[in-house]
Amino acid sequence: MKILDKNKNLLAEVIRSEDIIHEKNFYTEEKEEFQFASFNLKENTVIKRHIHNKQERVIKSTSEVIVVIEGTIEVEIYDLDENLEHKCILNKGDTVALFSGGHGLKAIGNSKFIEVKQGPYNPETDKKLF
C-alpha cells in the first residue's frame, strides 16, 4: 500500500507478509535513491552470486525500512509539513519503507523489529524531532 501526501509524493510503502506473492517485485523505480523489493522464492531458487560495484551516488535524504520480527507496532506517517497523513498497524512479518516526510513508532505490547537505513548517520544533524 503506497502512502502519498496531498501532492502525490510517495511518503511510505507498507508491505504485508501475506501480500508477497510474486517471485520478485520492485516497489521503487531504478532511478530512485533507495531500492525496495520483495521476493517470494520457491525451493531451490538461486539468486546468482554477485558483488555490488562501488560507485558514487547522490543521496539527498534518508530512507528507512522497518521489518517487524515479533509483536505489533503502530506507525504514524507525516508529510514534509509535519501533518499526519496515515496511521497503520504492522504485525509480525510486515514491513514499511519510509521514503519522505516524518514518522513515529509505538510498540503495541512487546515488539521486535529491524531498522535499515543509509549511512553514515549523524545523530546530531540527521533528524529533527517534532
Language-model regions: role of each:
Residues 79-100:
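Short acidic-glycine-tyrosine-enriched beta hairpin
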Residues 43, 61-78:
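Glycine- and acidic-residue-biased ligand/ion/polar-headgroup-sensing regions
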Residues 49, 75-76, 96-98, 102-108, ...:
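Short beta-strand His + acidic residue motifs that chelate non-heme Fe in jelly-roll/DSBH
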Residues 39-60:
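Conserved short histidine dyad/triad with adjacent acidic residue
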Residues 106-130:
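Double-stranded beta-helix
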Residues 1-39:
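A short, N-terminal "cap"/entry segment at the start of jelly-roll beta-barrel domains
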